Swiss-Prot record:
Residues 28-61 form a coiled coil. It comes from the Archaea. This is Uncharacterized protein AF_2262. Keywords: Coiled coil.
Length: 62
């Protein structure tokens, strides 16, 4: 599949954008909704893990 490297890089960037947005919103609501902010931070960490896995896949395809 010749489009695979492009697709993987796109997913890395897309995942990063979601993670950053979760972190941004968590920061904004931390004082008013600490439990929701905590969940968003947990989700952001999972996205960070996915991002790292996808980066390894990108390295594998070159």
């Amino acid at each position: 599949m010749e489009k695979l490297p492009h697709l993987l890089r796109h997913w890395v960037e897309h995942t990063k954008e979601h993670r950053e947005r979760f972190e941004e919103v968590a920061s904004k609501i931390e004082s008013t909704h600490p439990e929701i902010a905590k969940k968003l931070k947990e989700a952001a960490e999972k996205y960070r893990e996915v991002e790292e896995i996808l980066k390894k896949a990108v390295d594998m395809v070159g």
